[in-house]
Amino acid sequence: MVRNKSACVVLLFSLFLSFGLLCSAKDFPGRRGDDDPPKRYEDCRRRCEWDTRGQKEQQQCEESCKSQYGEKDQQQRHRPEDPQRRYEECQQECRQQEERQRPQCQQRCLKRFEQEQQQSQRQFQECQQHCHQQEQRPERKQQCVRECRERYQENPWRREREEEAEEEETEEGEQEQSHNPFHFHRRSFQSRFREEHGNFRVLQRFASRHPILRGINEFRLSILEANPNTFVLPHHCDAEKIYLVTNGRGTLTFLTHENKESYNVVPGVVVRVPAGSTVYLANQDNKEKLIIAVLHRPVNNPRQFEEFFPAGSQRPQSYLRAFSREILEPAFNTRSEQLDELFGGRQSHRRQQGQGMFRKASQEQIRALSQEATSPREKSGERFAFNLLYRTPRYSNQNGRFYEACPREFRQLSDINVTVSALQLNQGSIFVPHYNSKATFVVLVNEGNGYVEMVSPHLPRQSSFEEEEEQQQEQEQEEERRSGQYRKIRSQLSRGDIFVVPANFPVTFVASQNQNLRMTGFGLYNQNINPDHNQRIFVAGKINHVRQWDSQAKELAFGVSSRLVDEIFNNNPQESYFVSRQRQRASE
């Protein structure tokens, strides 16, 4: 009787416990509390495994947990309150804010996210403690801890955040470059003729990056690359052009309405080709590419230029084929069949030499094309060409050289108002900070690696080329508020990159520690600016302009004694223009 009574008591207690578990599953004190339904669902389900008897009772318990927490779990994963989604949305909102407010906004997002990470770590510790207190068997305890770790330390959004944090370490430097309107990566060029034997590519318009470059938007820059033993088809262009050879050797021939000019070209040779002149080229070398930077000043559309090919097949076509036969036959005094043969060509011959802008040529043909060519010297009396590197460097010492040809000195450049320059920096050397008073320089990296640092006012972001009047007024007001505030623009430079230095923006170029840096540049002027007397003003080095200030001006400007100003700005009496980073580090 006593045994039966005891059994009844045990049975009643078990039923009561099961009923209480089913009714209070949602109130089970899980490891995270009310703000984590997914975890509470896991706690509830695991409790069903521990405290229920029989498979049916366990299934009923788990169904109750699922009905209370399972749906919430799925909703939570797609709700914007999810930490990772909330962080991403926060960052996205920051990107839409003004540039000056963006860093503070991003910092707030990061701080909030880090607080949630700390909370997650605390919850993991609580979960782990719960496992040690509730689980008795070692295998269950290990399983419990493993589930805690998966929930709080190895979840996907935490791993994404860690990867994002690694990216943010380099984002500060890369962000300037990615949003830098003055740095044109070599991929900024668009190929017009990309063929087996060569490539002709054009840089995007300068003002497409930012309105501050509108002053030089009438110029376009292109790069012509011809493979060894390659001929470039004759063509003329609706633009005034300057050819600047940066690599290889070849022959450049062009015909004006009066004369034929032919030049042997090597790095440093500058050739001025008037608009409408028919020009063709040949790469004389058997191994190296002939690479030429071509500056265009269009005469029709200031934003666009076109090439016209008298001979061609498909791409490019001969522009003569656009005329009707009723015009061509009497104009050339020839039969229609001969015209078909001329413009169609022999199929086998076309297949052998190619059909594009660039044609493979024999060495005999290349030599014949260069027989009448002359080699430009410094000025050499040539009407249209000279070699920039044959003249005396404007600045030079053991760390570098700078060559320059200005419109007032070279008649080849006077009517187009362009300065041509070349910079050679030895490894580990610096072209000291300076600025140009009138010229905006477009610099092309020809060889080596390095970087550029430039001081820029805080400029508004470019929204569109044609801006609304209201946007312009807002930008003008913002510029006035930020007057006298600057930011550093730093860009890594490698072969093929373009960097634009606006007039009066202080700038410095630095060669890498293990490579020389070789660059060429075009100094461009706004059409309303007289290019004469552009001044390059140095702010460091032996001839920096601060040395010439009055003592009182130095003291009032810097707020220290003029002696200290002189000590700093006169501290490099032997070096001008170029200095070595190695020597400065050795003195430290």
Curated annotation (Swiss-Prot):
State the InterPro entries in the record: Cupin_1, RmlC-like_jellyroll, RmlC_Cupin_sf, Seed_Storage-Functional, Vicilin_N
State the superkingdom: Eukaryota
Q: Which GO terms describe its molecular function?
A: nutrient reservoir activity
Taking every annotated instance into account, which residue ranges of this chain make up the domain Cupin type-1? 182-340, 386-566
By sequence similarity, the record places it as follows: Belongs to the 7S seed storage protein family.
**Which organism is the protein's source?**
Gossypium hirsutum (Upland cotton)
* Name of this chain's protein: Vicilin C72
Q: What is the stated purpose of this protein?
A: Seed storage protein.
